[in-house]
Amino acid sequence: LLPRAFVKSSRTDAMLDLQHGYVAVDSSSRKSGENVMSEIRGALGSFPALPLNAEVAPRSILTGWIAGEPLPDGLSLGEECEMKDPIEGGAVVKCQHQELRCDEIDKHLEAGKQVTKLALILDDHVSFVLGDDLVIRKLKFLDGALDQLENADQDGVRAELDARFALMSAEVRRLFLLLEAALKLSKAET
């Protein structure tokens, strides 16, 4: 008998928005995201893609939002953030389940800390944590988004999956377009 390696299968969902020129990969692992992009390139033959890049430092925008600068229409602050001292090896403050517009947070900002992760909510439909690396974490569709599914046709599991995907992709598209404008994301040269 020859030894056999165990095959581990996995599934990673992704959404291509060719109209707006981005790919959203549902993975917490950068390596998994790169594997998905490799598979897309293999299937299509060529697929030029670059990671997101902002013209303005995301830390300064996130810090401004938590300091009281106006958020883009539709966005509101969540109850979670991470702030870091900009010096190497500086202090890190993590807040969860906390009002972010308060004296305690203001004191950290006055001490020079910058926001590196910030929980945000889009129109009571989607909550997420945006990092200064432009990675969206903890993406969650809220009741406001899922209420729209109650009116969907109940023609079976396939129809429900199609409706869920359509709803989720529309919300992700709205989120991306809002963040693209707010963070001044640069487009790849074509």
Labelled PLM ranges:
Residues 1-190:
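Intrinsically disordered, low-complexity, charge-rich terminal extensions
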